[in-house]
Amino acid sequence: MIYIAATSRLAAHVNMLIAQGWLLFFVCLTGFAKEPWFNWTMISNSDAIMANMPHIIGFLFVIVETLIVKAFVIPLFLKKVVKKTHAHRDTDANIPHFYCLFISSIILFAGFLVANIDIPELKLIDPMYFGVSSAIIITSLWLITIKHKVLSNVIGFITMENGIFLFSLSVAKEMPIIVNLGVLLD
């Protein structure tokens, strides 16, 4: 996210969307392995597979959708749009890129500070996911407001959706499939 704030090249923004898609894929893959219903020994037990079938279907949907849509389909479509429009840079930002980098770093730091506040009611929330996702959402909203090109705004919106998806993984463990369906509708 900090790199997206620091550069004006749209191809680099699209490449960062690909990296975000792969990172979200690995977060989903490792995050679901910590779920109480998931156990490596259930692979050989057909009764355990049938008992956890709704969880397995949701897990497979989230994994496949994250990898295919977020890491391949949307970035490849945006690369094609960047090539056809010959819009290679967004140099019309309201704020110079150094200040964008500085403000994005402050937002990321503030996200980690907020995530590590010791409130007993928030113990169910994963602080790493919460801190990163809140920083991604706020930075994306901020970048959408200061950029002028439509492609930069679309990339900011998709990055914000990635942050919302990560936020749903940290807060609502049972509902990432609903969040993914909402993102697919966008």
Question: Each PLM stretch: what is its role?
Answer:
Residues 1-186:
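Alpha-helical transmembrane segments of multi-pass membrane proteins predominantly involved
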